[in-house]
């Protein structure tokens, strides 16, 4: 056993052995991508009873008692939450995405706000200002701005959380029917409990994970749509136990049901379930086929009844949703680091000035020369220096901008409203506007490097359309260009009373051929479509409704229906169709069902005239291998397939074969033997299928369009031009996902596609090179550090969920084997075990990093058959190893985890419910709006925020550092240059509005030019507009401005006389002069930084200056001094100073020296080193005329491809087994005795323990 333990890590470059190292309970099994066998119920029951009985009992620790809520109050069902407090381990059904409630809002919100370094700093500062020995300014200068910051942020957070409450209530208050007091009563979802019996009606969402007990279907079937879970819109069927379906139909029967279910604990495995139902002294095995998961929608079943097994947070979909993460932007983190940097600068400046105070006191202080400054305190010079340090911390505190965060929140709030109000992102057919569900991430939208997109409902409309076909070498169906130009008319199907009115086709020649009846192959072509399928038909209100295992198959049967070959009904052994009005019944001899390995399906029927014929449809790659050598239309069909593939249509080849009676009887014996094989049944059937599917005659091929949402290709094209890489993560089949990749222009024939096997080779080579390098092989160093792939060709990855398990998931040993491990006893054994663990972790991390490096070299990545957890892990890998900004977009509950994991989560509303929208940061109705969200709103938000921050730091440095220079002339006494009210109002009134408007309204180019030139988006991805370099440039700019603002007035005031013979060089006149020069300078500076001028911008700049003068004259008036003499001490300072022309000349000179060098530098930069934005601004009119031509993508041409995987089968396996078992056929309900007779190996005696 020790050998097994060590061998796990011997060769990590190889594919792990899943027999030894399976995935843990919380991980995805390898069976995810393997075909699922829909065997008849009885076959599975017998196998389970014989083989799985013992382990089921051991693993099932979750107990659910029907109709007995008191059962869950037992002590063994309680879990400790805190100290001695306990709560039930069974979760309620209410979901929660909000963060606060009325009790926790204030403490939690304040805690979150004070986690910001600046807020905590100002709280400490406020406390220091209450100490009179060190404070030279009043505490109100800090308290008022701090309360303003905390209050505005709290209101914004409250508004956001109220919106989350509303969304949660919308879900939690949905109605459901629950057995209460012996009868069904209307109950809200949030009041549903584990153990309740509920009724779910047609087209309703399943509110919890429930055990299907019975349904309106006579065969105990229930059809569900799982689009919210796995993104697939084709219907799946669930089957209840026949015993419960028979006995639990009526209300009183359900109310009396007292069964006990023992099953697995809540987990995130969507396709696995193990449990046992104990009822009436018998036990019945349960599997995933009997479970309805929350998020499914009941379709084509009038009603069904179920027992709630898991509720709320315990449901599988919620287990896949992940935790709500607090998201912050890169600029948030950068701002925090810059605030820390300012803290350091502040401490250094205060310490330096405190040292200066110490030396000044020792040489020139009151005890020596300046006796007139004696304050009565006999403090030593060092102690006075210590007090000065804290005094300067208070005086220079505005280096750390207290209003920074509240200003940022106001700007983000305004930008969010602009997104909400954007009519170009409004989807009128569903009355759905764009919605910014958070107000904290807008500028991050301008820095996206990777987009992770769901496929179903996000890129596609989930609509399959029969577009074209080729029959006997002739192609039917017109091109899109002809349709748009109006050259062809839509086919009129009014002659067919059974035609589907929603079906459209544009080629009247085909309908003429059918109705003429001259071409035998055309007749056989559509007869094949009507016969060779596993679709089930039912009539609802006199209307014929089809239920297909895949939307592709449904589209083909619907096409045959409209062309006059209508599938009407089927039984276990027959299928009835209408052939141009004549009803015919064919005997079904065998159905050779589709799976992902066969890539085809066949049906063998006995025709009314007694002949036996095999009809087959499948991918051209497998059909062509099985054709008879004498097939004259092979080349013509091949050319048509190339044309279809060039248009990204999903193709299927159709063929048939006549079988003589003797050959069929011999084959039938082998088929029956394989059907009842106890081991390797699927392999045996495949071999039998291969034997009969030979020497086929080709009829033609079909072409189905998987409709993309509007302008998906154009959106992806523009995003790619913006250097954004797009990864598609879907739960759908590989072939389907690959086809969509071609349709939306992620892939083309110039792209080399790498699959799992190819990637393994690359990764193994890289890891060998790394080992060689570690062992001293210098020759491998260049390979290890180089690129995986050549740069002269485009590459793409297409990988499956099962392959991803090798990269994403931590693998464990089986529990039964883990118990046999030898525990280390000696110190050496412990060190060896630790070394092995560290080695395994390092190798796993190395493999993950190599995979990410390889994937990021590709132009596109498509991950198919992935679970919600795997989607999130893929996103996390790129975040972790590339440090890139990521965006995830999806529309279903299966995308929630991915949406929460990415830096930005976008929900597509109106497709598959609201769960993705509820968990998203932004939502809208169509994928095409993503380009406007990023290239326009995201880019503008990033530019505005960067410009705002650069200017904000600049104006605060310019304001604060004047105190620093003044200290060298006031004995380092911590005296301020300005009056206290100017310090309080500078960031609130005098300089705040212009920069706020720039943060809200500024735009370097228009929205049309932003979309036409996506390369303008790149600076945000590279953090070019705000980084430490820009920060220190703002610091340097502020230092220079502060020097000019202090020393020019200082020099002008030195030894100067006024017109009245009095010296204007008093402290208050100097304070007024420097303050006036500062306000004018910083407001004109924001004017220089403004790219998009409006009346509001101009008014704010001149209005701020006017407000300054108005307030200053009021505060310096004698009247207010009389009312508050201690608060307003600058009486008459402004009127006396500003009536001197000499001081106005000083102010003008100071402003000119501050601004003229900036104007000159800006002019030189735009002339000599213009940016892309500068070039477009300069030639804006010319570029506007070229927008439409440059924005259009080139026509897509795949060229002739010899390889197509885009065949029209998107499902795992059809309904063949179900049809063969007869459970799909309408029949009378079986008697109770007959039901029990079907459970000979399943039912065992069981005595419930009380």
Swiss-Prot record:
Going by the UniProt record, its keywords in alphabetical order are: ATP-binding, Cell membrane, Cell projection, Endoplasmic reticulum, Golgi apparatus, Lipid transport, Magnesium, Membrane, Metal-binding, Nucleotide-binding, Phosphoprotein, Translocase, Transmembrane, Transmembrane helix, Transport
Q: Where in the cell is it found?
A: Cell membrane; Apical cell membrane; Cell projection, Stereocilium; Endoplasmic reticulum
Chain segments carrying region Disordered = 1-52
Per its record, the protein catalyses: ATP + H2O + phospholipidSide 1 = ADP + phosphate + phospholipidSide 2; a 1,2-diacyl-sn-glycero-3-phospho-L-serine(out) + ATP + H2O = a 1,2-diacyl-sn-glycero-3-phospho-L-serine(in) + ADP + phosphate + H(+)
Any ranges marked Cytoplasmic in the topology annotation, and which? 1-133, 360-385, 978-980, 1056-1069, 1114-1117, 1162-1250
Which cofactors, by name? Mg(2+)
The entry's family comment says: Belongs to the cation transport ATPase (P-type) (TC 3.A.3) family. Type IV subfamily.
Quaternary structure and interacting proteins, as annotated: Component of a P4-ATPase flippase complex which consists of a catalytic alpha subunit and an accessory beta subunit. The flippase ATP8B1:TMEM30A complex can form an intermediate phosphoenzyme in vitro. Also interacts with beta subunit TMEM30B.
Name this protein carries in UniProt: Phospholipid-transporting ATPase IC
| Species whose genome carries this gene | Xenopus tropicalis (Western clawed frog)
Q: Which gene encodes it?
A: atp8b1
């Amino acid at each position: 056993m020790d050998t097994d333990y060590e061998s796990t890590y011997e060769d990590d470059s190889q594919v792990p052995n899943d027999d030894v190292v399976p995935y843990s309970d919380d991980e995805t099994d390898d069976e995810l991508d393997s075909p699922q066998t829909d065997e008849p119920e009885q076959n599975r029951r017998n196998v389970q009873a014989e083989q799985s009985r013992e382990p089921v009992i051991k693993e099932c620790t979750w107990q659910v008692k029907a109709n007995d809520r008191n059962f869950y109050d037992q002590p063994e069902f309680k879990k400790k939450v805190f100290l001695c407090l306990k709560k039930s381990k069974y979760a309620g059904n209410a979901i929660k995405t909000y963060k606060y409630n009325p009790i926790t809002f204030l403490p939690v919100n304040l805690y979150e706000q004070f986690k910001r370094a600046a807020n905590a700093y100002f709280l400490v500062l406020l406390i220091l200002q209450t100490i009179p020995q060190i404070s030279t300014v009043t505490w109100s200068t800090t308290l008022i701005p701090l309360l303003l910051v905390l209050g505005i942020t709290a209101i914004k957070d409250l508004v956001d959380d109220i919106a989350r409450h509303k969304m949660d209530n919308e879900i939690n208050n949905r109605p459901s029917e629950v057995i209460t007091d012996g009868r069904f009563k209307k109950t809200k979802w949030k009041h549903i409990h584990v153990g309740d019996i509920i009724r779910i009606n047609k087209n309703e969402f399943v509110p919890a994970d429930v055990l299907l007990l019975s349904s309106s279907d006579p065969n105990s079937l229930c059809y569900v749509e799982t689009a919210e879970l796995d993104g697939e819109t084709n219907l799946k069927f669930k089957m209840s136990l026949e015993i419960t379906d028979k006995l639990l139909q009526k209300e009183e029967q359900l109310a009396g049901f007292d069964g006990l279910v023992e099953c697995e604990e809540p987990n995130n495995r969507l396709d696995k379930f193990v449990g046992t139902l104990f009822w009436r002294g018998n036990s019945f095995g349960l599997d995933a086929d009997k479970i309805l998961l929350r998020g499914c929608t009941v379709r084509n079943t009038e009603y069904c009844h179920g027992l709630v097994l898991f509720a709320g947070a315990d449901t599988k979909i919620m287990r896949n949703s992940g935790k709500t993460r607090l998201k912050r932007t890169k600029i948030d983190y950068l701002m925090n680091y810059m605030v820390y940097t300012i803290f350091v600068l502040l401490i250094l400046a205060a310490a330096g000035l405190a040292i200066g105070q110490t030396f000044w006191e020792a040489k020139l202080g009151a005890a020596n020369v300046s006796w007139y400054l004696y304050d009565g305190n006999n403090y030593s010079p060092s102690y006075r220096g210590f007090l000065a340090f804290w005094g300067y911390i208070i005086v220079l505190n505005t280096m750390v901008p207290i209003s920074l965060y509240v200003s940022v929140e106001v700007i983000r709030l305004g930008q969010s409203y602009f997104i909400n109000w954007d009519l170009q992102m409004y989807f009128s057919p569903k009355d759905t506007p764009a919605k910014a569900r958070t107000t904290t991430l807008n500028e991050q939208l301008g820095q996206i490097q990777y987009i992770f997109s769901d496929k179903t409902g996000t890129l596609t409309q989930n609509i399959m359309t029969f577009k074209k076909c080729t029959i006997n070498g002739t192609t039917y169906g017109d091109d899109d260009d002809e349709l748009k130009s109006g050259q062809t008319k839509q086919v009129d199907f009014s002659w067919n009373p059974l035609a589907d009115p929603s079906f459209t086709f544009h080629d009247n020649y085909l309908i003429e051929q059918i109705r003429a009846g001259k071409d035998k192959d055309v007749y056989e072509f559509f007869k094949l479509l009507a016969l060779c399928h596993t679709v089930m038909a039912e009539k609802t209100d006199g209307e014929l409704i089809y239920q297909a295992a895949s939307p592709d198959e449904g589209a083909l049967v619907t096409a045959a229906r409209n062309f006059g070959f209508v599938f009407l009904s089927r039984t276990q052994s027959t299928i009835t169709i209408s052939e141009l009005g004549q009803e015919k019944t064919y005997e079904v001899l065998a159905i050779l069902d589709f799976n992902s390995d066969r890539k085809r399906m066949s049906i063998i029927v006995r025709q009314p005239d007694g002949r036996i014929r095999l009809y087959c449809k499948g991918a051209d790659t497998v059909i062509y291998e099985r054709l008879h050598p004498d097939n004259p239309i092979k080349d013509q069909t091949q050319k048509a397939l190339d044309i279809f593939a060039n248009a990204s249509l999903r193709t299927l080849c159709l063929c048939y074969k006549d079988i003589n009676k003797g050959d069929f009887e011999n084959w039938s014996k082998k088929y029956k033997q394989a059907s009842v094989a106890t081991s390797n049944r699927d392999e045996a059937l495949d071999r039998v299928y291969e034997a009969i599917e030979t020497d086929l005659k080709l009829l033609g091929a079909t072409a189905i369009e998987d409709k993309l949402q509007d302008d998906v290709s154009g959106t992806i094209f523009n995003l790619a031009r913006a250097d954004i890489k797009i990864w598609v993560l879907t739960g759908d089949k590989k072939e389907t996902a690959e086809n969509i990749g071609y349709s939306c222009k992620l892939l083309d024939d110039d792209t080399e596609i790498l699959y799992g096997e190819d990637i393994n080779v690359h990764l193994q080579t890289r890891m060998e090179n790394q080992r060689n390098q570690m062992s001293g092989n210098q020759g491998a160093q260049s390979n290890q550090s180089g690129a995986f792939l050549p740069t002269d060709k485009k590459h793409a990855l297409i990988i499956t969920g099962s392959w991803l398990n090798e990269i994403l998931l931590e693998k464990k040993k089986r529990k039964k084997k883990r118990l046999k491990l030898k525990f280390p006893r000696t110190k050496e054994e412990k060190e060896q075990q630790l070394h092995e663990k560290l080695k395994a972790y390092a190798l796993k991390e190395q493999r993950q990093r190599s995979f990410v490096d390889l994937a990021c070299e590709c132009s596109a990545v498509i991950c198919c058959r992935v679970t919600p957890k795997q989607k999130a892990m893929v996103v996390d890998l790129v975040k972790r190893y590339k440090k890139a900004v990521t965006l995830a977009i999806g529309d279903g509950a299966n995308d929630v985890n991915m949406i929460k994991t990415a830096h930005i989560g976008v929900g597509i509303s109106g497709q598959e419910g609201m769960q993705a929208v509820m968990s998203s940061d932004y939502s809208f109705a169509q994928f095409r709006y993503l380009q406007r969200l990023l290239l326009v709103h995201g880019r503008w938000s990033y530019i505005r925020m960067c410009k705002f921050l650069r200017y904000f730091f600049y104006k605060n440095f310019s304001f604060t550092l004047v105190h620093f220079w003044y200290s060298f002339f006031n004995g380092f006494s911590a005296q301020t240059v300005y009056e206290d009210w100017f310090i309080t109002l500078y960031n609130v009134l005098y300089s705040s509005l212009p920069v706020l408007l720039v943060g809200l309204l500024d735009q370097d180019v228009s929205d049309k030019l932003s979309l036409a030139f996506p390369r303008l988006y790149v600076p945000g991805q590279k953090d070019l507009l705000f980084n430490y370099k820009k920060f220190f440039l703002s610091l340097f700019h502020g230092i220079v401005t502060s020097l000019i603002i202090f020393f020019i007035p200082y020099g002008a005031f030195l030894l100067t006389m006024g017109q009245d013979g009095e010296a204007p060089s008093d402290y208050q006149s100097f304070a007024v002069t420097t303050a006036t020069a500062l306000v004018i300078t910083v407001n004109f500076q924001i004017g220089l930084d403004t790219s998009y001028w409006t009346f509001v911008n101009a008014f704010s700049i001149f209005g701020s200056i006017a407000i300054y003068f108005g307030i200053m004259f009021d505060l310096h008036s004698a009247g207010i001094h009389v009312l508050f003499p201690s608060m307003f001490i600058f009486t008459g300072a402004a009127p006396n100073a500003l009536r001197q022309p000499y001081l106005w000349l000083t102010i003008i000179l100071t402003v000119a020296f501050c601004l003229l060098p900036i104007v000159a530098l800006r002019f030189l930069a735009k002339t000599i080193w213009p940016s892309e934005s500068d070039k477009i601004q300069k030639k804006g009119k010319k570029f506007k005329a070229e927008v439409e031509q440059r924005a259009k993508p080139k026509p897509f041409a795949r060229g002739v491809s010899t390889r197509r995987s885009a065949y029209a089968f998107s499902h795992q396996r059809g309904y063949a087994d179900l049809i063969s078992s007869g459970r799909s056929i309408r029949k009378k309900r079986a008697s109770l005795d007959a039901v029990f007779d079907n459970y000979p190996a399943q039912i065992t005696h069981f005595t419930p323990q009380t």
